């Protein structure tokens, strides 16, 4: 039986990390986790990592699509934080960011790793940005690395 399974090391991969500036005090930790995972676990060279900053999570899909369209990247990691407030704004932003990034991934033919926190409160966001619940930026980066390798294996199979 042939089993295809992605590995985490991707030393030659070119990865874009796109991050929302809104809630930067959380997102900066997500970026730190993602870049650390790319370099330490994935063995990605510093010069092969591009960091792109957008105003907020709603703008992530457009920037990710444009980066994918350049065909210069093997994967893109999208990072941001949307915290529920007292209005319906949370549902719109979180839903559009999620849906938009999923559409880009399917249409661009490269992995788009979803590292957007959608939390009820700031405490949950902090926990997921490197404290109690790990670092979701690092997790998204590892998803991107694994998918780069897996898609290469599928192509070669």
From Swiss-Prot:
Protein's UniProt keywords contain Hydrolase: no
Catalytic reactions of this protein: (2S)-2-hydroxy-3-oxobutyl phosphate + 5-amino-6-(D-ribitylamino)uracil = 6,7-dimethyl-8-(1-D-ribityl)lumazine + phosphate + 2 H2O + H(+)
GO cellular component, one term: cytosol
Binding site for 5-amino-6-(D-ribitylamino)uracil: 22, 57-59, 81-83, 114
Domain of life the protein comes from: Bacteria
Pathway info: Cofactor biosynthesis; riboflavin biosynthesis; riboflavin from 2-hydroxy-3-oxobutyl phosphate and 5-amino-6-(D-ribitylamino)uracil: step 1/2
GO molecular function: 6,7-dimethyl-8-ribityllumazine synthase activity
Alphabetized CDD domains for the sequence: Lumazine_synthase-I (cd09209)
EC class of the enzyme, as a word: transferase
Entry-linked InterPro entries: LS, LS/RS, LS/RS_sf
Keyword Membrane annotated: no
EC number: 2.5.1.78
Active-site residues, as the UniProt record annotates them: 89 (proton donor)
One of the protein's GO biological processes: riboflavin biosynthetic process
Assembly information from the UniProt record: Forms an icosahedral capsid composed of 60 subunits, arranged as a dodecamer of pentamers.
Matches recorded under PANTHER family: 6,7-DIMETHYL-8-RIBITYLLUMAZINE SYNTHASE, 6,7-DIMETHYL-8-RIBITYLLUMAZINE SYNTHASE DMRL SYNTHASE LUMAZINE SYNTHASE
Purpose: Catalyzes the formation of 6,7-dimethyl-8-ribityllumazine by condensation of 5-amino-6-(D-ribitylamino)uracil with 3,4-dihydroxy-2-butanone 4-phosphate. This is the penultimate step in the biosynthesis of riboflavin.
Name of the protein in question: 6,7-dimethyl-8-ribityllumazine synthase
């Amino acid at each position: 039986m042939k089993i295809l399974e992605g590995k985490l090391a991707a030393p030659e991969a070119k990865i874009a990390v796109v991050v929302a500036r809104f809630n930067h005090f959380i997102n900066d930790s997500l970026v730190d986790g993602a870049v650390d995972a790319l370099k330490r676990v994935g063995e990605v060279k510093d010069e092969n990592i591009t960091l792109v900053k957008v105003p907020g999570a709603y703008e992530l899909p457009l920037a990710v699509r444009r980066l994918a369209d350049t065909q210069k990247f093997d994967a893109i990691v999208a990072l941001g934080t949307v915290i529920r407030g007292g209005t319906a704004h949370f549902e719109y932003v979180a839903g559009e960011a999620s849906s938009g990034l999923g559409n880009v991934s399917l249409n661009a033919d490269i992995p788009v790793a979803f590292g957007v926190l959608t939390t009820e409160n700031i405490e949950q966001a902090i926990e997921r940005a490197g404290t109690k619940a790990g670092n979701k930026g690092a997790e998204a980066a590892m998803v991107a690395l694994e998918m780069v390798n897996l898609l290469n294996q599928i192509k070669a199979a």
